[in-house]
């Protein structure tokens, strides 16, 4: 059934939004996995766990915001299967942070692609929505993760348990 409120909202934009929702669901699921991995008794890095669980919550808010916009524009949300996280054992903090950075770059590229599609379809509402709620936050998060990776390497690299502990205590407790 077609929406009575749909106006200037192309079907390819609608499909791209549904794909982005799926990517955000997958990211939230991955960050939840990361968060609870670092909460395990044999890993026990509370600050790292908290950092990733906060990201899971932010991604949840992101996909809900996208779904709400989809409904407001007269689009239809089509849910897809969510892929299992790539790992069950995430290793040390630098490995997990690198995986998270790759995920954020993938999300950022998907947002940029959707913005370009919105521009090509002359959809200023979509472009403004993405600029207001997503694009700037993604860039800030990628920068923050890059800073965290730099500090982790300064503290002794991926094999330095004390460096990982100090990073967790001194950096992530202040976020």
Swiss-Prot record:
Domain Ferritin-like diiron: 7-156
CDD domains referenced in this protein's UniProt entry, alphabetically: Ferritin
Keyword Metal-binding appears in the UniProt entry: yes
Amino-acid biosynthesis recorded as keyword: no
Region (Catalytic site for iron oxidation) location: 54-61
Gene Ontology MF annotations: ferric iron binding; ferrous iron binding; identical protein binding; iron ion binding
Residues involved in Fe cation binding: 54, 57-58, 61, 64
An individual GO BP term: intracellular iron ion homeostasis
InterPro entries the UniProt entry points to: Ferritin, Ferritin-like, Ferritin-like_diiron, Ferritin-like_SF, Ferritin_CS, Ferritin_DPS_dom
N-acetylserine: modified positions: 2
Sorted UniProt keywords: Acetylation, Cataract, Cytoplasm, Cytoplasmic vesicle, Disease variant, Iron, Iron storage, Lysosome, Metal-binding, Neurodegeneration
GO cellular component: autolysosome; autophagosome; azurophil granule lumen; cytoplasm; cytosol; extracellular exosome; extracellular region; ferritin complex
Top-level lineage group: Eukaryota
Subcellular location: Cytoplasmic vesicle, Autophagosome; Cytoplasm; Autolysosome
Function of the protein: Stores iron in a soluble, non-toxic, readily available form. Important for iron homeostasis. Iron is taken up in the ferrous form and deposited as ferric hydroxides after oxidation. Also plays a role in delivery of iron to cells. Mediates iron uptake in capsule cells of the developing kidney. Delivery to lysosomes by the cargo receptor NCOA4 for autophagic degradation and release or iron.
Disease implicated: Hyperferritinemia with or without cataract: An autosomal dominant disease characterized by elevated level of ferritin in serum and tissues, and early-onset bilateral cataract. Cataracts may be subclinical in some patients. Neurodegeneration with brain iron accumulation 3: A neurodegenerative disorder associated with iron accumulation in the brain, primarily in the basal ganglia. It is characterized by a variety of neurological signs including parkinsonism, ataxia, corticospinal signs, mild non-progressive cognitive deficit and episodic psychosis. It is linked with decreased serum ferritin levels.
Family stated for the protein in its record: Belongs to the ferritin family.
Complexes and interactors: Oligomer of 24 subunits. There are two types of subunits: L (light) chain and H (heavy) chain. The major chain can be light or heavy, depending on the species and tissue type. The functional molecule forms a roughly spherical shell with a diameter of 12 nm and contains a central cavity into which the insoluble mineral iron core is deposited. Iron enters the spherical protein shell through pores that are formed between subunits. Mutations leading to truncation or the addition of extra residues at the C-terminus interfere with normal pore formation and with iron accumulation.
Name of the protein this chain belongs to: Ferritin light chain
Lineage: Eukaryota, Metazoa, Chordata, Craniata, Vertebrata
